[in-house]
């Protein structure tokens, strides 16, 4: 038989089984013994002359001071920056700052904690969560009640050690009233600061920096100026335009009583004419002539048009008559040709005999009679040699 298959185990089952050992390394470290370590605070101190002494000045000193065990805070927070205690004020308001409060704490709970002598309680509340932010201010009646409340610092309140200190007074931001006054400077400007190079102070041969404004080799030096007005302001010129004194054109005395100075000025500086000395021209007569010419032309055009129309109408009936006569002549010629073709065969022999016996007078008479007979029947005889 083959080897047995090993059973599979999930990761959670492996981690949860204590037979394989502890998986939390922090628990192993907590079991090891540890020596207490002293916490120290550092202070940085710089000599006042190190900023202007150059490279030869001693550098700043770094001191490490071991904090005494009495200055350590209670509650496992360790030692931190020790702020100077604010003295108890001698005048009201006597306000204490209370910190490290529970977020579920109310003003009534805080009043019960301090007891009597409390005038007002103000908890700082978060506007989003509408819960306490963990600190507040309590105002007392006298300085003695405030000092008694400071003795309660470190006491347990709802599972937290309370931290009580004297509240700092409100800072007064006194600003100048700039809405009133005449905005006039009282006195000269303060002296200007010496100009500095964009690369900082210059270094001399002695190894120290010097101010470039104090260098005697500098060419440009700024002298202090005092912006003080010497005397009153000049009067302002009127912004209004002078009014024009117009005189009537019909006054004849203006030209006669003209002063010689005025004549000299006008003669020396003649006025410019924008039209170049041109005079107005009367164009009415020219326009009338042009209109008459145009009327004559239109009349002549109308006459020629009417004559052309009359000629075209008179030519049409004569042409129609000529066409009709041409058609009738052609028809009569065809008919005569047919008749002549039939009669030539029958009377060829008789015609020759009659022609020999007939005289010229007798030949004309039957011809006329034959023509009249044909006209009565509606036929006309046309000779063979006629061409159309």
UniProtKB/Swiss-Prot annotation:
Q: Which CDD domains match?
A: RRM_eIF4B
Write the lineage as a comma-separated list: Eukaryota, Fungi, Dikarya, Ascomycota, Taphrinomycotina
Judging by the UniProt lineage, the source's domain of life is: Eukaryota
Q: Where is the composition biased (Basic and acidic residues)?
A: 171-185, 208-229, 289-349
Where are residues bearing Phosphothreonine located in the sequence? 61
Q: Name the chain's protein.
A: Probable RNA-binding protein sce3
Task: Quote the gene name from the UniProt entry.
Answer: sce3
Name the Pfam families for this protein. Answer: RRM_1 (PF00076)
Q: Does the keyword Phosphoprotein apply?
A: yes
Key word RNA-binding present: yes
> Which Gene Ontology terms describe the biological processes this protein takes part in?
cytoplasmic translational initiation; eukaryotic translation initiation factor 4F complex assembly; formation of translation preinitiation complex
Species: Schizosaccharomyces pombe (strain 972 / ATCC 24843)
């Amino acid at each position: 038989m083959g080897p047995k298959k090993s059973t599979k185990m999930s990761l959670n089952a492996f981690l949860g089984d204590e037979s394989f050992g502890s998986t939390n390394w922090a628990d192993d470290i907590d079991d090891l013994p540890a020596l207490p370590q002293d916490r120290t605070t550092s202070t940085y101190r710089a000599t006042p002359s190190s900023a202007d002494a150059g490279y030869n000045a001693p550098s700043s000193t770094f001191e490490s001071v071991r904090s005494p065990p009495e200055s350590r805070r209670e509650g496992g927070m360790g030692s931190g920056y020790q702020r100077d205690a604010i003295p108890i004020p001698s005048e009201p308001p006597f306000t204490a700052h209370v910190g490290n409060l529970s977020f579920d704490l109310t003003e009534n709970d805080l009043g019960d904690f301090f007891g009597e002598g409390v005038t007002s309680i103000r908890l700082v509340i978060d506007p989003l969560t509408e819960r306490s932010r963990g600190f507040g201010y309590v105002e007392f009646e006298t300085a003695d009640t405030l000092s008694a409340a400071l003795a309660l610092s470190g006491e347990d309140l709802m599972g937290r050690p309370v931290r009580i200190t004297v509240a700092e007074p409100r800072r007064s931001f006194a600003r100048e009233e700039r809405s009133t006054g005449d905005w006039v400077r009282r006195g000269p400007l303060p002296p200007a600061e010496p100009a500095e190079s964009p690369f900082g102070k210059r270094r001399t041969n002695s190894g120290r920096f010097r101010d470039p404004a104090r260098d005697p080799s500098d060419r440009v030096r700024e002298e202090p100026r005092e912006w003080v007005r010497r005397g009153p302001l000049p009067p302002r010129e009127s912004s209004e335009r002078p009014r024009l004194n117009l005189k009537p054109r019909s006054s004849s005395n203006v030209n006669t009583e003209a002063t010689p100075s005025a004549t000299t000025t006008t003669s020396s500086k003649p006025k410019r004419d924008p039209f170049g000395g041109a005079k107005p021209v009367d164009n009415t007569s020219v326009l009338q002539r042009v209109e008459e010419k145009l009327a004559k032309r239109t009349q002549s055009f109308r006459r020629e048009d009417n004559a052309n129309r009359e000629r075209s109408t008179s030519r049409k009936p004569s042409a129609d008559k000529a066409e009709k006569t041409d058609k009738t002549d052609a028809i009569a010629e065809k008919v005569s040709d047919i008749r002549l073709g039939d009669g030539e065969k029958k009377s060829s022999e008789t015609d020759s005999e009659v022609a020999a016996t007939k005289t010229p007078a007798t030949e004309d008479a039957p011809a006329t009679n034959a023509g009249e007979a044909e006209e009565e029947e509606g036929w006309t005889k046309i000779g063979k040699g006629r061409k159309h």
